[in-house]
């Protein structure tokens, strides 16, 4: 994930990242809009502006996560509660599911899968939140 400056998005708080494969090739774009504001819907979600697929000329995914965390004062880190961190990991799991999709047909790309499977990647990611190595690095 490499932050990409200079891309116009819906709000100055939203950030854009180019996602690259291990070989350096571009995989897609990830947009993160994490802070609450008066004009923003409540809740947290992942969605795709563009699904990734190989049909025809194919398309690279453009995935976004929206959260409603309290914005910290300028220059300070955003501190999250355990529940907020769990939500972040859950929605980022959905984002990775959308970003790492490798399918021919757009109709089955990313989270466009059976209801009994769509929550699996996000819930697995939630559980990584409590892995000691993850806590040591990010908490």
Say what each PLM segment does.
Residues 1-139:
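Cation-handling catalytic/transport regions enriched in His/Asp/Glu
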């Amino acid at each position: 994930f490499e932050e990409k400056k200079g891309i116009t998005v819906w709000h100055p708080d939203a950030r854009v990242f180019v996602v690259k494969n291990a070989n350096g090739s571009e995989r897609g774009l990830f947009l993160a809009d994490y802070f609450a504001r008066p004009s923003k819907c409540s809740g947290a979600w992942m969605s795709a502006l563009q699904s990734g697929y190989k049909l025809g000329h194919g398309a690279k995914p453009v995935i976004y996560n929206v959260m409603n965390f309290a914005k910290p004062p300028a220059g300070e880190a955003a501190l999250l509660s355990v529940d907020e961190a769990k939500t972040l990991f859950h929605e980022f799991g959905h984002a990775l599911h959308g970003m790492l999709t490798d399918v021919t047909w757009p109709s089955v790309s990313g989270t466009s899968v059976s209801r009994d499977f769509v929550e699996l990647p996000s819930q697995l990611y939630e559980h990584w939140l409590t892995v000691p190595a993850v806590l040591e690095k990010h908490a």
